[in-house]
Amino acid sequence: MYDYIKGTLVKITAKHIVIETNGLGYIVTVANPYSFSDQMNQTIQVYLHQVIRDDAHLLFGFHTEDEKEVFLKLISVSGIGPTTALAIVAVDDNQGLVAAIDNSDIKYLMKFPKIGKKTAQQMVLDLAGKFAELPAETTNTTANQTAGNQQLDEAMEALLALGYKATELKKVKAFFEDTNETAEQYIKSALKMLMK
């Protein structure tokens, strides 16, 4: 098991980042890869959770230990795998998630990708009261301003990778067409819109 990895960020894609350390490039799947854009070619530290399957060894990465803790609590729920948990963690703060679980707000929980009624009910059953020690925000990142449309396209790719449907994202993309934000900012704003 790994706690974290520290190395040079050498690549960013819609689904993962690549961190090079000691001559090896590690593929680390993260909730919002573009939140690392301002750290390209710099030394970074990412908290890890390793998933070992018959056909693959996967690394899931997080900005903070709190973000990792939310992820671990989510994958403890029957019906929630690492990819779905990562999509939930991608929402900028966990206030809505915690409130929905503590208030048994099944409709809110069903707004997350791949979460149906049965899984939402299981989340409430398994996680009620277990997030009390976590802060309201799980991430603390910034990014540099770059060309808007390319950044918007990258954000939409990342949201597709998290499991959102193209039909949902078409409306969101149209809303942001005339704006100039970073991919990270687009993702945060889009997630807030999708959760309403």
Swiss-Prot record:
Residue span of region Domain I? 1-63
InterPro entries in alphabetical order: DNA_helicase_Holl-junc_RuvA_I (IPR013849), Hlx-hairpin-Hlx_DNA-bd_motif (IPR003583), NA-bd_OB-fold (IPR012340), RuvA (IPR000085), RuvA_2-like (IPR010994), RuvA_C (IPR011114), RuvA_C_sf (IPR036267)
Could you tell me which cysteines form disulfide bridges? none
Q: Which UniProt keywords apply?
A: Cytoplasm, DNA damage, DNA recombination, DNA repair, DNA-binding
**Chain intervals for the UniProt region annotation (Domain II):** 64-142
Q: Does the keyword DNA damage apply?
A: yes
Q: Where is this region: Domain III?
A: 147-196
Q: Name one GO cellular component term.
A: Holliday junction helicase complex
Molecular function GO terms recorded: ATP binding; four-way junction DNA binding; four-way junction helicase activity
Q: Which BP terms from GO are recorded?
A: DNA recombination; DNA repair
Q: Where in the cell is it found?
A: Cytoplasm
Segments for region (Flexible linker): 143-146
- Main location per the UniProt record: cytoplasm
Note the subunit structure. Homotetramer. Forms an RuvA(8)-RuvB(12)-Holliday junction (HJ) complex. HJ DNA is sandwiched between 2 RuvA tetramers; dsDNA enters through RuvA and exits via RuvB. An RuvB hexamer assembles on each DNA strand where it exits the tetramer. Each RuvB hexamer is contacted by two RuvA subunits (via domain III) on 2 adjacent RuvB subunits; this complex drives branch migration. In the full resolvosome a probable DNA-RuvA(4)-RuvB(12)-RuvC(2) complex forms which resolves the HJ.
Free-text note regarding domains: Has three domains with a flexible linker between the domains II and III and assumes an 'L' shape. Domain III is highly mobile and contacts RuvB.
Its biological purpose is as follows: The RuvA-RuvB-RuvC complex processes Holliday junction (HJ) DNA during genetic recombination and DNA repair, while the RuvA-RuvB complex plays an important role in the rescue of blocked DNA replication forks via replication fork reversal (RFR). RuvA specifically binds to HJ cruciform DNA, conferring on it an open structure. The RuvB hexamer acts as an ATP-dependent pump, pulling dsDNA into and through the RuvAB complex. HJ branch migration allows RuvC to scan DNA until it finds its consensus sequence, where it cleaves and resolves the cruciform DNA.
Q: Which family does it belong to?
A: Belongs to the RuvA family.
* Protein name (database record): Holliday junction branch migration complex subunit RuvA
What's the source species for this entry? Streptococcus thermophilus (strain ATCC BAA-491 / LMD-9)
